[in-house]
């Protein structure tokens, strides 16, 4: 969550269950009142993923949409390429070689962009983690996209 003053709060499904997320969203809506808007990444099945992981991914997406609808929080679905085009700059990009093909390493590129835009932010999931959480970076960048587009 990015508040109007730019401060951020995080709630991860790795640390919380759906009930915790519902309480988190309800509290955010109470604090933000009418200015509360959510931006979520528009997801699709990932080629090569197992049926189980695709189902789990879709279930989580559906539950989050359901919570937003139930709490009457307006939301926007943003395709990954849309927010990435707005947020990433050439200096952020990391190229990877996979099977002889070059392509953008989306996780590393988002981490670079998040560090550039929010240099004082700790992007670890919690204080015990040693590495940066790319999901937290993506969530922050999607919020920043929404802020820039006045969504």
Locate predicted features.
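Phosphate- and other anionic-substrate recognition elements at nucleic-acid/protein interfaces
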Residues: 1-151
């Amino acid at each position: 969550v990015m508040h109007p003053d730019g401060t951020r709060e995080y709630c991860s499904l790795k640390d919380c269950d759906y009930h915790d997320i519902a309480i988190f969203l309800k509290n955010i809506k109470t604090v933000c009142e009418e200015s509360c808007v959510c931006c979520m990444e528009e997801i699709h099945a990932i080629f090569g993923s197992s049926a189980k992981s695709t189902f789990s991914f879709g279930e989580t997406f559906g539950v989050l949409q359901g919570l937003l609808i139930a709490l009457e929080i307006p939301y926007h679905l943003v395709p990954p390429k849309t927010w990435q085009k707005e947020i990433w700059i050439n200096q952020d990009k990391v190229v990877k070689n996979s099977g002889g093909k070059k392509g953008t390493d989306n996780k590393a590129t988002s981490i670079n962009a998040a560090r550039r835009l929010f240099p004082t932010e700790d992007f670890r999931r919690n204080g015990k983690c040693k590495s940066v959480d790319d999901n937290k970076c993506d969530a922050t960048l999607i919020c920043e996209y929404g802020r820039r587009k006045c969504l």
